[in-house]
Amino acid sequence: MAAPQNYLAVIKVIGVGGGGVNAINRMIEVGLKGVEFIAINTDAQALLMSDADVKLDVGRELTRGLGAGANPAVGRKAAEDHREEIEEVLKGADMVFVTAGEGGGTGTGGAPVVANIARSLGALTIGVVTRPFTFEGRRRANQAEDGIAELREEVDTLIVIPNDRLLSISDRQVSVLDAFKSADQVLLSGVQGITDLITTPGLINLDFADVKSVMSEAGSALMGIGSARGDDRAVAAAEMAISSPLLEASIDGARGVLLSISGGSDLGLFEINEAAQLVSEAAHPEANIIFGAVIDDALGDEVRVTVIAAGFDGGQPPSKRDNVLGSSSAKREEPTPARPSESRPSFGSLGSVKPKEEPEPAPVPEPVADLPVSPPPVPPSRTYSDSAAEELDVPDFLK
């Protein structure tokens, strides 16, 4: 007889390196339920401080438990050397979160290795990492960028939290300790926003397959968090989440959105609907929006909204460039309003002439049509090619 099957999704959260281990300590502290915590580090001393269910010292041979010295190559080698052990602790997971603070050694180098192992075992793999504060130095920032690019190749979805953005929502008197704590808190929110959807039975319940449909091979993702009290609290919290300072870009155009709304037992279905509607309007018209509502009496009259938007890789950067081009072309075409119908053809013809003359003949087209009187002075100097001369010389007259 086969053993009875466990039909609950197995979720494992792996903290890699100092930042990742600190983050899972914070998650354990606040009582994140329904997940197994694994701490992986090359620093034996930091591992001693961890409350994780499983601790893996991957630096005992390579670094003698003394850490990677902020060298990603050492972190990568340490994780590769202990690949079988990491594989063993990840076996059986349906979903794996890889969390790390990018820019150091173990997290930056080891996280892509851990993610690669998790994905090869068939788990839905989500990276939740922080980009370092500016005050941590340029070298760390450069290492972080390389690490993020590497990790993006190995995960289904990657959420990057820029620590600098935390400064914009912090008090000027905030201590360094509190700044890093708030970074851990955001990592917690990213993981909790997803795991609660799966593990906590809610008003509007979601299962693992719902989450997988949005996050499988989704590429880069954005995460926003908002909370509010009082009138229209759900809508206010949703607005705060989609315009969150933590978002490096807009969620416009996202094809997959996870929306988690938590509130006390007085949380109304109508409130949830309004908040979900607001988020759906901000996303792509064809977006797959998965939303769930969780009742948590500990929140009192507060409503908390977590939005995770994914599935717009390649869409976002071009849209920004388009805007830039749009603004410059708008400037060029300022003189055109008089005769909009002629603006396009003349712009094209000038484009071909441009290399011969000045680099800025763009304003010429419309005025040429507008001022048929301008050609007369031209013939004396150039009688042999009327049309070309007109086109090229008109800008000087206009100026």
From Swiss-Prot:
Q: Does the keyword DNA damage apply?
A: no
**Which keywords has UniProt assigned to this entry?**
Cell cycle, Cell division, Cytoplasm, GTP-binding, Nucleotide-binding, Septation
Alphabetized SMART domains for the sequence: Tubulin, Tubulin_C
The domain of life is: Bacteria
Biased composition (Acidic residues) is annotated at 388-399
Asked if the Swiss-Prot or TrEMBL record annotates the protein with the keyword Protein transport, the reply is no
Region Disordered, as annotated, extends over 311-399
Q: Which Pfam families match?
A: FtsZ_C (PF12327), Tubulin (PF00091)
Set out the biological process GO terms recorded for this chain's protein: cell division; cell septum assembly; division septum assembly; FtsZ-dependent cytokinesis; protein polymerization
Localisation: Cytoplasm
The molecular function terms in GO held by this entry are: GTP binding; GTPase activity
Q: Which family does it belong to?
A: Belongs to the FtsZ family.
Subunit structure, briefly?
Answer: Homodimer. Polymerizes to form a dynamic ring structure in a strictly GTP-dependent manner. Interacts directly with several other division proteins.
Please identify the protein, giving its name as recorded: Cell division protein FtsZ
The source organism is Streptomyces coelicolor (strain ATCC BAA-471 / A3(2) / M145)
* The organism's taxonomic lineage, starting at the top: Bacteria, Bacillati, Actinomycetota, Actinomycetes, Kitasatosporales
